[in-house]
Amino acid sequence: MMALFELPQINNVRTKRNVIRALEKYKIMRVRLGERRMPKLTSTLTIVPPSFNNEFHSTTEESAIWNVDAVNEAKAYVKLIDHHINQLPERSRQVILTKFIEENSDYEAMLAIHVSHSQYKEEKRKAIERLAYQLNIVVEK
């Protein structure tokens, strides 16, 4: 009997790499939320005539706009990843948080979630796969 739906074979190495990149970006974006880009200060003063075509030429204005856009991008990305991590089953969420967010070793993560080595390896594989599917970053074979 043929199954109605079969999941495609995935490339575990490349999928894991994508998940790690997404989580690294997540951590960077969390840090970025506390930083601001400062306008450039120059030793010369130039007069820029007013523009009536809605273009900005001031570095202060450009920096302010960049700050707002960067903060909004960071907030959106952090919210997206938080949402998908929170949708994972409890054990998968524990693996992602202890191993990839807190950057513990496999051994430390295994001890933190109280499982055997073989259970940890299986849970880690499942957690990566689940998060990859949720983020739509799975690499198929």
Swiss-Prot record:
InterPro entries: ArpU-like (IPR006524), RNA_pol_sigma_r3/r4-like (IPR013324)
Annotated SUPFAM superfamilies: Sigma3 and sigma4 domains of RNA polymerase sigma factors
Name the record gives this protein: Uncharacterized phage-related protein Lin1259/Lin1739
Organism: Listeria innocua serovar 6a (strain ATCC BAA-680 / CLIP 11262)
